[in-house]
């Protein structure tokens, strides 16, 4: 792996919800360092729905070294849930930058990324697919990533947010 020519493309909602299902909270600063040290990631794109109330979180993520790519959110009329589906933006950015990186890491469990993962794999551009949770990862994604899939289930000690004790 060449130093500094690998990019990460992170489906933030999928990552956040996947880790939450495992019962822990990801320390995004540690995660960015981990991506740099383990996979030589020079650019880490994080795709997320934009909510004005989350400005301090966005600033914190940018301070940790993420490049944020926003999508306007939609509020469902039926249940009031907020939707910020970023799949198309992630795929588009991965293709825009295709000639700029040596290898890509896709962080998601979403089977909608199967075609991107398959394409990157066939072009020898896929470093890894990082899925937050082995039990909630799409079978399509697992099949297309083949031996290049890793799961974050066992990374809690390394990447979990730890509260500072006030004692």
Predicted segments, located by residue:
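Terminal and domain-boundary accessory regions
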Residues: 1-167
């Amino acid at each position: 792996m060449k130093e500094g020519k690998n990019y990460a493309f992170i489906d933030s909602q999928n990552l956040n919800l996947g880790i939450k299902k495992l019962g822990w909270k990801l320390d995004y600063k540690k995660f960015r360092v981990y991506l740099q040290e383990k996979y030589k990631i020079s650019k880490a794109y994080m795709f997320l729905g934009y909510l004005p109330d989350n400005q301090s979180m966005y600033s914190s993520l940018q301070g940790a070294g993420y490049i944020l790519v926003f999508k306007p959110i939609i509020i469902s009329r039926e249940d009031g849930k907020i939707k910020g589906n970023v799949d198309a933006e992630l795929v588009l950015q991965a293709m825009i930058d295709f000639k700029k990186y040596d290898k890509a890491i896709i962080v998601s469990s979403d089977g909608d990324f199967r075609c991107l993962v398959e394409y990157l794999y066939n072009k020898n551009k896929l470093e890894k697919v990082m899925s937050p949770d082995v039990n909630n990862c799409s079978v399509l994604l697992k099949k297309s990533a083949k031996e290049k899939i890793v799961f974050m289930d066992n990374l809690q000690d390394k990447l979990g947010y730890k509260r500072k004790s006030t004692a």
